């Protein structure tokens, strides 16, 4: 962060390494350059009705009803000092949170799936994900997050897929679709 706090976030995959299943998004903080770390804590939870992606495979293991919180992406805002944080739920909904205290607390998740809906005129996705990895902030202040979209017909519902970005010009208040990389070109569909 701008204050020098290190934030380590990850998917905590319980009961296996697969992309679908009981997955939480966890965070640890360090304020001393990584010499010590806070306890791990779950930071992504969506209140209310969540739903399950219809393309989700049958889940096994200790909790077959568990949800998939996936693909976390963070951006440290050099201008405001905020930490912008995006994640997906069940590869079908995307959410945005913000921290103004170096990751100690985060705002309630805001559904930003509407940005992905803007892609539908070019690509009729059934599976979406932010990232993986990190987003960036441009000099103009624009926040840019890599995303991928899939038709969900192969590869554990992750294929065929294309890559793009979503972006915000108002510090995360609203999000919009970027351009799909090499649209309508079969050679670039994963």
Regions found by a protein language model. Give the residues of each.
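Asp-box/BNR beta-propeller blade signature and adjacent active/binding-site loops
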Residues: 1-190
């Amino acid at each position: 962060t701008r204050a020098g706090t290190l934030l380590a976030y990850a998917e905590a995959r319980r009961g296996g390494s697969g992309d679908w299943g009981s997955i939480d998004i966890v965070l640890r903080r360090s304020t001393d350059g990584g010499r010590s770390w806070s306890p791990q804590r779950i930071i992504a939870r969506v209140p209310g009705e969540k739903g399950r992606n219809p393309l989700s495979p049958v889940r096994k293991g200790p909790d077959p009803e568990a949800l998939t919180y996936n693909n976390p992406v963070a951006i440290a805002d050099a201008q405001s000092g905020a930490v912008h944080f995006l994640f997906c739920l069940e590869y079908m909904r995307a959410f945005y949170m913000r921290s103004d205290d170096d990751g100690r607390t985060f705002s309630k998740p805001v559904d930003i799936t509407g940005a992905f809906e803007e892609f539908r005129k070019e690509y009729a996705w059934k599976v979406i994900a932010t990232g993986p990895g990190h987003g960036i902030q441009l000099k103009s202040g624009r926040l840019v997050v890599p995303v991928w979209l899939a038709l969900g017909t192969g590869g554990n519902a992750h294929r065929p897929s294309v890559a793009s970005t979503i972006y915000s010009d108002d510090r995360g208040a609203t999000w919009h679709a970027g351009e799909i990389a090499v649209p309508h070109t079969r050679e670039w569909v994963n």
